[in-house]
């Protein structure tokens, strides 16, 4: 096998696309850029997210993810939850284990008719019952 028999691997060498070199080439006149307009001009680059005048996707979708800077209080109805009544001591961690509320919650308010009766069991200052401030 000599050097004269060497060939590049199939598909590794592509033919150069010469544009704007006459109509006979099939890529003359507009040089594969289509008609007139902004996209036919040199230096044109669309902004990220630009959809040709259509309302962009990021403006069509609703805004999400806002969290207020005010304190986050989680309310628990005692009448609907028997497990709270059975606790000996009501602490923030014991309520979190029962309810799995998010980490950004700073306090818990126990509401319902029986909430005031549980005030003696509360051992955490982050927990209030209805009627307390």
UniProtKB/Swiss-Prot annotation:
It comes from the Bacteria. Keywords: Ribonucleoprotein, Ribosomal protein, RNA-binding, rRNA-binding. Disulfide bonds: none annotated. Residues 1-64 are annotated as: Disordered. GO terms for molecular function: rRNA binding; structural constituent of ribosome. GO terms for biological process: translation. The keyword Ribonucleoprotein applies. One of its GO terms (cellular component) is cytosolic large ribosomal subunit. Binds to the 23S rRNA. HAMAP family: Ribosomal_uL15. Belongs to the universal ribosomal protein uL15 family. This is Large ribosomal subunit protein uL15.
